[in-house]
Amino acid sequence: MTETPQVPPRRLLIALGSLVLILMVGGAVSFVRYARRHAPQPGLIAVAPFDIFAVGLDRWRVGLATALSERLNAPPLAAVPQTVVAATWRSAPRPEISAVELARQTGAGLAVYARVDSLPGKPDSVRVSLLAIDATTTKVLFGVLLRWPAADPEGLAARLAEHVRHNHPVRTFPP
């Protein structure tokens, strides 16, 4: 005697198919909600600690980042608090990449990385380089290169904030 394979009843197949469909739709909805909640905020800026390569200006490392964050933290922009930056920051051989990772971890749409270098033969001045990087695409949106008096870190923070506000994709005032 040969046995014929049992074919499941049609209702059972419909029920299993419906269950699979419901689970797929539920997973898709869950993913979309998660992605929307964790999308970078375009008006949020993560200012990484400055790299300081100028003798005697080590105090600027966090101080400049804090001052710049405070000046950028006004509508329509917002800055990630430096306490959060300190807890999240992970240095790497390429600090601009670390700045982008900082922005991604904090939900910021823009990463700001800057460095301060000594100028040969000019002990009273420094060269400041700033990069603003889109955290989603990792594209450099703009850069700033300044020569600045070493005795004026507050003025430097104000000037850099002005550059960031003026060039940020979320326009803060007409061009």
What are these language model-derived features?
Residues 2-20, 26-43, 121-125, 136-175:
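C-terminal/domain-edge helix-coil "capping" segments
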Residues 40-126, 134-148:
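Short beta-strand->alpha-helix linker/helix-N-cap micro-motif
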